């Protein structure tokens, strides 16, 4: 019996195509049907979740506020009237946007203490505002947003909207900040 795994079909020019790359493990087969939804792994973020959309919308609003000088009320009104978003997304995005701006005087020092080599005003606008949203959630949304979720969401959003190393930077800063907030899971043990 021969090993067919390295036998490649010639392409139109008669050349052999390279072997497909992969981990060599077959994908697990999941049953389809009622109750067979795949489980999310540790650290997975569902990109279409309501809260994820709200955080993204809040980031865009904070970014606009930071860089354009548009009025806070103008941005907030537009945020609340975005018909493309469900009301739950608009409501939570507005909570984050207004909460971050209201509490900037207490949020920015937390970030500055965790990253003393990087003055908050000099941080990239995306990184700065992702961190602000995460710190706001850690301080004021702990009943509905677990510590790990706030951190993982911030990292994912930083990866999606920030520079190449934004995810790592946000992860490091929030790792330091998170020590100030005991994790409910660990506290319950």
Where do the PLM segments sit?
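N-terminal interaction/assembly modules
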Residues: 1-167, 171-189
